Amino acid sequence: MSEEKLKKKSFEIQRIYIRDASFEAPNTPNIFHKKWDPEIKFNLSTVSKKLKPNIFETNLQVRVIVKSEENLVFLCDVHQVGIFFISCLDEQELKHCLGSYCPNILFPYARTCISSLVSYGSFPQLNLSPIDFDDIFCKNLKSKRNNFYQKENI
């Protein structure tokens, strides 16, 4: 690794891969004959960790649960992971990069995987909207600050 690379702010994608993907449609084939009135629940979370100096892993976990008339139609989980080289960022910049920028890179891959799994399950196409990870990161940061101050004031 070049010395110059370690002395300036740098970001590189080293690898993007699926760690885990699952699709469950426990009520098939009967669910295909029922009225289609989907209720979609969507959850996501990220976990990041340092693997080596300047090498970080971000795991974006996306879960979609679809019910129709109280019946589980399908459940889809995807853990989309990226390994990134990141150098010369201060602590706050690194947190922002791992909590917002990296998940933003990973989400289109996870969305494509989920869409494919749903299609292969013979269900109508599921197009997940883009996510504003920057907004989520800022809200979580603000919430953590508020919780910290509330605990300090007790």
UniProtKB/Swiss-Prot annotation:
The gene is secB. One of its GO terms (cellular component) is cytoplasm. Keywords: Chaperone, Cytoplasm, Protein transport, Translocation, Transport. This is Protein-export protein SecB. It is found in: Cytoplasm. One of its GO terms (biological process) is protein transport. One of its GO terms (molecular function) is unfolded protein binding. Belongs to the SecB family. One of the proteins required for the normal export of preproteins out of the cell cytoplasm. It is a molecular chaperone that binds to a subset of precursor proteins, maintaining them in a translocation-competent state. It also specifically binds to its receptor SecA. Signal peptide: none annotated. InterPro entries: SecB (IPR003708), SecB-like_sf (IPR035958). Homotetramer, a dimer of dimers. One homotetramer interacts with 1 SecA dimer.
